[in-house]
Design a protein with these regions (language model features):
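Amphipathic alpha-helical membrane/lipid-surface binding segments
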Residues: 4-94
């Protein structure tokens, strides 16, 4: 079973990476044309939401008691995979 602290650290690291990518994509949005800007803004909002969800999940994991962590590890890992899919979907719109 994955250790609680390792998973929380993984989530935090991923959210920091996403935060940096959001900044990069925001710069692209500012340089985009009017129509593209609207589409990019939607993607940016989705990306920001996913980064925030990852940070929130990291906090929940970090704050969980060991017994609770045993119960939530599977669901937390699945939630993280879904966050990654949502992130990839949003990023694909910038390609």
């Amino acid at each position: 079973m994955m250790l609680k602290q390792n998973f929380a650290d993984q989530l935090k690291a991923q959210s920091e990476i996403w935060k940096a990518q959001v900044k990069d994509y925001q710069e692209r949005v500012e340089q985009a044309g009017e129509q593209a800007r609207g589409e990019y803004k939607k993607s940016m909002e989705q990306m920001q939401d996913k980064a925030e969800e990852a940070r929130n999940l990291a906090e929940k994991v970090r704050d969980a008691k060991e017994e609770a962590w045993k119960d939530m590890v599977g669901a937390s890992q699945k939630a993280f995979v879904e966050l990654q899919r949502g992130w990839a979907d949003a990023v694909s719109r910038f390609q």
